Amino acid sequence: MLDIKFVRENAEIVKENIKKKFQDKKLPLVDEVIALDEERRAAIARADELRANRNKISKEIGALMAQGKKEEGMALKEQVTAQAKELEELAKKEGELGEKVTQIMMSIPNIIDDSVPIGKDDSENVEVQKYGEPVVPDYEIPYHTDIMETFDGIDMEAAGRVAGNGFYYLMGDIARLHSAVISYARDFMIDRGFTYVVPPFMIRSNVVTGVMSFEEMDAMMYKIEGEDLYLIGTSEHSMIGKFIDTITPEEQLPLTLTSYSPCFRKEKGAHGIEERGVYRIHQFEKQEMVVVCKPEDSRYWFDQLWKNTVDLFRTLDIPVRTLECCSGDLADLKVKSVDVEAWSPRQKKYFEVGSCSNLTDAQARRLKIRIKGENGNYLAHTLNNTVVAPPRMLIAFLENNLNEDGSVNIPEALRMYMGGKDKIVPKK
C-alpha cells in the first residue's frame, strides 16, 4: 500500500504506474482518494481549531469565575458545549473518511521497479537465467500421477471420497520422497544462515489484509466459520504477520527466516489437463523463505532469495529457468517478482515451481512493521520466496529422474533422507 502523502504529491506518477499494469479502470480512484483525503484533512484541521479554541475558552471561564463574573462564564460554557458536539461529529466524519481512504488505497497498486518489463500478462514475462540442459529422453515419460501409481504411491480416488476434488493420499516411497524434499530444503536454508520456524497455520483478518489484496484474499483464502481466522495460503502470511506492530533495531537486521507449513487454497478448477493430478490442489506443503530488512538492502536480498531456489534445484540436477514477471503479471503489492520454472521432459516445456517477490514497504505500512534507526523509526522492507513446494517439485523430480524401466534415481543430496537409497523401484 502506498503512502497517501505520496499519492497526493505524485498523482501523475501513480496514474502512469496503473497504466503500466494495464489496470486503467482504477485510474479514477487516484483523484477520488485525493479528494476524500482533502476532506478528511479539512475535518482534522477544523477539529484542531476547535480544540485550541476550547482550551482558550476554558482558561477564560476560569478567570471569569474567579472574578465573580458567573453569567459571562456560563455563556462561554455554552460555547464549549456546542463545540463539543461539533467535535464529536467531526471525529465521526474523520473516521468514516479515513476508512474510505484506506479501502481505496488498498486497491491502488504499488509502484513497480524501473527494471520491470512492461507487459499485459505472464505470456510477456522475460527469461533472465537458465541452468541445466533440458533433456527429452527417447522413452515415454508418463503423467506424474501414473508414475506415482506404479509405486502404489498415490490415491486420489480415496481422497476424493474423504475430502472431494483437489486432495490426495501419498504413500510409501512417494510419501517418503515428499518428506525428504521438504527436510532437505529446510536443512539447505538453515545451512545458508536462515532461522527455521514453524508458524501458525491460521491467521486473523487484519493480518490477511496486511499481506495481500482483497482480490487475492477472496480467490485464495478459506475462512473458519464463526471465527476471525483464515487458513494460510502460504507461510509467508503468518511469518510476515509475526512482526505486526513491532519496531526492530537496525542492528538486528536483516531477519532471515525459513518456514515450513501446510498451505490451503481455494484455487482449483478448469485449468486444463496439465493441471489435473497434484499440480493445482487445495492442500499442499511448502518450505518458504522470508526476509525483513532495511530499504537499501531489499534489492540485494531479492536476488539472493531466488538464487537460493535455483541453487537447490541445481543440487538435484533439475534444469530450471528464472522469468522476470512483467508489469501486468505483478500482484498489486509487489514491486518486483520472478518465477522459477522447472523443466518437464514429458511436456517438453518449463512449468512454475516457485516465485520470489519484493514488496518493499507495502506490507510493512499495512502491518506497521518498523525499524528503529538513529534518526527515528521508519518502515521495513519485506520479501518472500518459495524454497520448494511439493508436490509440484515431485512432478519435476520424478520426470527428470525417471529411468526407462520405471525406477527413479535418488540424487546424493536426498539419500540421507531416503534411508540411503540411490533408487526407488516401482511395485507395478
Give short role names for the model-derived ranges.
Residues 1-134, 149, 153:
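N-terminal alpha-helical targeting/anchoring segments
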